[in-house]
Swiss-Prot record:
Native source species: Christiangramia forsetii (strain DSM 17595 / CGMCC 1.15422 / KT0803)
BP GO terms, sorted: translation
Protein known as: Small ribosomal subunit protein uS8
Keyword set includes Zinc: no
Pfam families associated with the record: Ribosomal_S8
MF terms in GO: rRNA binding; structural constituent of ribosome
Lineage, uppermost ranks: Bacteria, Pseudomonadati, Bacteroidota, Flavobacteriia, Flavobacteriales
Amino acid sequence: MNTDPIADYLTRIRNANAANHRVVEIPASNVKKEITKILFDQGYILSYKFEDTTAQGTIKIALKYDKLTKEPVIKKIQRISKPGLRKYAGSTEIPRILNGLGIAVVSTSHGVMTGKQAKANKVGGEVLCYVY
C-alpha cells in the first residue's frame, strides 16, 4: 500500500521524463486528476486521458519535450507537503516559483489550483508541489 499517492504520481512523471518516455500511465484519484488538468493548462504536458477500465481508473499522460533540444519541459517536479509534515500557506504566503516561471500547486477549500489562482481568489491551503 502506498502511503503518499501524490508523491508516487510525481515520481512516476519524474521517472518517465528521465527515461524520455512519451506516455506514462498512473492510477487515478480526484486530486491527481485535478493536478493533471493544471499541468495541461499550464503547458507542462501535451495531453491526458482518464480511463475507467479498472475499479480505480487510470490517467494516461502524454509528456511534453522541447522540439529542438529534446529536453523535458518539466525540469523539476517536487513534493512539498508530505503526510508526515504538512505545509500550509495563507494567500499572501504562497511563494512565486522561479520568479514566476514555475507554478505551485495548492489544495484549497475551493479545490486544487495554482498558487497564482489561489492568490487571486485570496485563499490559502496546503502546498502540494512545485513544478518548473
